[in-house]
Amino acid sequence: MKTIKVTQIKSASHRLKNHKLCLQGLGLRRIGHTVEVQDTPSNRGMINKVYYMVSVEE
């Protein structure tokens, strides 16, 4: 399955609880942290929710 590189570029403090949980679900812990996740509809949904805090590379 295809993978996506996701990097956190903004802080999660003072954000909505659901958005913090999405970052946690993606495996992101801090600014500058990069993870590779599989390209699934659930991961895409989490990325779309926190689009303003992450950068995505195909």
From Swiss-Prot:
Q: Does the keyword Cell inner membrane apply?
A: no
Q: List, in alphabetical order, the Gene Ontology terms for molecular function in this entry.
A: structural constituent of ribosome
Gene Ontology process terms (BP) = translation
Identify this protein by name.
Answer: Large ribosomal subunit protein uL30
Family as reported in the entry's similarity comment: Belongs to the universal ribosomal protein uL30 family.
Which keywords appear in this protein's UniProt record, sorted alphabetically? Ribonucleoprotein, Ribosomal protein
Which interval of the chain is the signal sequence? none
What's a GO cellular component annotated to this UniProt protein?
A: cytosolic large ribosomal subunit
Subunit notes for this chain? Part of the 50S ribosomal subunit.
Natural source organism: Acinetobacter baylyi (strain ATCC 33305 / BD413 / ADP1)
